[in-house]
Amino acid sequence: MQEQYRPEEIESKVQLHWDEKRTFEVTEDESKEKYYCLSMLPYPSGRLHMGHVRNYTIGDVVARYQRMLGKNVLQPIGWDAFGLPAEGAAVKNNTAPAPWTYDNIAYMKNQLKTLGFGYDWSREIATCTPEYYRWEQKFFTELYKKGLVYKKTSAVNWCPNDQTVLANEQVIDGCCWRCDTKVERKEIPQWFIKITAYADELLRDLDKLDHWPDTVKTMQRNWIGRSEGVEITFDVKGYDNTLTVYTTRPDTFMGATYLAVAAGHPLAQKAAANNAELAAFIDECRNTKVAEAEMATMEKKGVDTGFKATHPLTGEEIPVWAANFVLMEYGTGAVMAVPGHDQRDYEFASKYGLTIKPVILAADGSEPDLSEQALTEKGVLFNSGEFDGLAFEAAFNAIADKLAEKGVGERKVNYRLRDWGVSRQRYWGAPIPMVTLEDGTVLPTPEDQLPVILPEDVVMDGITSPIKADPEWAKTTVNGMPALRETDTFDTFMESSWYYARYTCPQYQEGMLDSKAANYWLPVDIYIGGIEHAIMHLLYFRFFHKLMRDAGMVTSDEPAKQLLCQGMVLADAFYYVGENGERNWVSPVDAIVERDEKGRIVKAKDAAGHELVYTGMSKMSKSKNNGIDPQVMVERYGADTVRLFMMFASPADMTLEWQESGVEGANRFIKRVWKLVYEHTAKGPVAALNVDALSEDQKALRRDVHKTIAKVTDDIGRRQTFNTAIAAIMELMNKLAKAPQEGEQDRALLQEALQAVVRMLNPFTPHVCFTLWQELGGEGDIDNAPWPVADEQAMVENTTLVVVQVNGKVRGKITVAVDATEEQVRERAGQEHLVAKYLDGVTVRKVIYVPGKLLNLVVG
């Protein structure tokens, strides 16, 4: 064994060994308990960032630990390879998205290997390959036949200059990112999957997810947004149709003083024909983004349509307004307004001088003061005719029943969740497998024509999708009849909604999944990824699992038993102000800093002499230039050091502050372990450990070893507090470094301890542990070694610490045998000099003894 720890030599050698031995390749084995450990697959952007490294290190630690417990562990990896960034990069680099993507995959795969992640590379998937997306296309056609897929018009961002659809990210301050033209909202036909058909089950089954963070479950509950209410129909004078609204507060119905419809509603469109102000308003709304966050804060505007609706219970005529806060995509595109008891309705009514009628009493029974705001709390009705005096629930039921009796209302359960729009007017995605015949009939692509392959050898102009620009690509025949292919592609959330299941059978050619393999491995035991995916990916992931279950492919109801959301990685951020007042962000690597005595940054400059402004720690990002390149750190310290720091610096679900001093500390610790093993093995063969022959000091050290094994096992396995597991190993290492190493049993005990330490560290620092295990004479590869088991007998305490008080004040602590009598404890206390001086020349009047814990001597 060489004296110096040289990670650059060890790591490449161990990685080659894993590759050659195919150490982490697994197959189904009914005789073993399975464990499926999965980290969210990366987008091949070009280089790994520290967020990736943290995510995948957590996954690898869990997988290696479970493997050492003797389980059959699947840990696969792949690439979420379709998406908009590839199109932008292709235009910028004058290439096509496919070669750019495949080059990035090759580069990042090598990066993952240098970090020593124990993946089963035989199961690698790239979602942009026809071998993968063909099954997604086939499944989509089956969902269409089941009635779970439909097409309808929906609003998109449209650039009138480029004549193209823009993604939300391509709209900058309401203008096209390329040509700065004002972006419009345009209705175009798009494909949808009926996720709403599963809304109730998606909501209900959240209760089964005991090992998912409550924050994620709450976000999904709110996103699904189940509500119980009443759907009410209004007659409108001079309009051919009725208006239908939904309300969760029918108790306030007698206070409805106007209706509001979306600018795109047919009623508003009809009214606009003779109303120039309304027509201009509708035009303005067409260019308004409809993101919910913006809807909440934007100014509420409207125009009176001139139509009057009849209140079904009072017979009063109430005005119908077109308003920018009502969306056609939500509900019926019309809402009932009760300004006395809804703040948004109140602000709108106040702005336009509309009637505000209170119908709910304040909590103290008085009429509410509506001079400044609406009363939104529930309460007792007044001003409501026959319903006066009823509280919320009774009023809800009475008014709902009355509306039903008159044939103008029915109770409804509503969901905030909308069907999933899967059409994207982009090129780099899986083609949607639908065709349109010359007579307008829409059909799924026949199975013998699947997959519909996306051409990869294309020229990107940055404006139009190559498959939209090429009329020949769309031409096909179905049953001998000419047809045109759909030129939209799938939302990339489609690919990431089922990849975890395909990992169980990536080479299977008979269908989307091999049910036998899928049901052996699924559900995933632990899924690791960022909380930013809480409502989009993680909801579609659950939805797709239920779709596959109902297609007979899987038997479980949910895709993953446990979800671990890792925290973000933060780093110092610095900038200097340029000549034009702009902020120039400087990498923390290039910042020369001065710190105060507490280690806080007080001054900073860069190599060019710019005085830097320090903004504190923030998420590593390109925009602040504060990302740390993992590759540079691996080359400087080794992968094991980077991994150890990542797991030690913070609990897995909390933010991690990148500090190079902490990385150096992790490196020093590995060197200490290396040094101790080197010194130990240099002394030659070790005798067998004889636990019966150990001295009290040796037994105490062995007790520490086995207590550490028990703690680390619990910290990794049950609590998943990986940082405290590492801290416990570090504490034990400090004791081992100070322990005697000369006697035969000293060395035998150290051998047992070091073999345990190396196995406990193996999930975190697998390269160095692989090497040290061999040096310590461990059997076989450490990758196949069992996890150390704590010896219960060794952990039994034969001594205990007793606190000694004199007149209730702590005067000392003594170590006594666990079975010591009160007399023996008193005698031992009297020998303790810190205690003895308080007993000199006084009489002990009373003794209070709590066995094994406390001795209080009352003196006078």
Swiss-Prot record:
Query: What's the catalysed reaction?
Result: tRNA(Leu) + L-leucine + ATP = L-leucyl-tRNA(Leu) + AMP + diphosphate
Broad class of where this protein is predominantly found: cytoplasm
Report the residue ranges where the short sequence motif 'KMSKS' region is annotated in this entry.
619-623
Gene3D superfamilies, A to Z? 2.20.28.290, 3.10.20.590, HUPs, Isoleucyl-tRNA Synthetase, Domain 1, Valyl/Leucyl/Isoleucyl-tRNA synthetase, editing domain
Q: Where, by residue number, is the motif 'HIGH' region?
A: 42-52
Which chain regions cross the lipid bilayer?
A: none
Which EC numbers does the record give? 6.1.1.4
Binding-site list for ATP: 622
* Database matches in NCBIfam families: leuS_bact
* UniProt-recorded name of the protein: Leucine--tRNA ligase
Taxonomic source organism: Salmonella enteritidis PT4 (strain P125109)
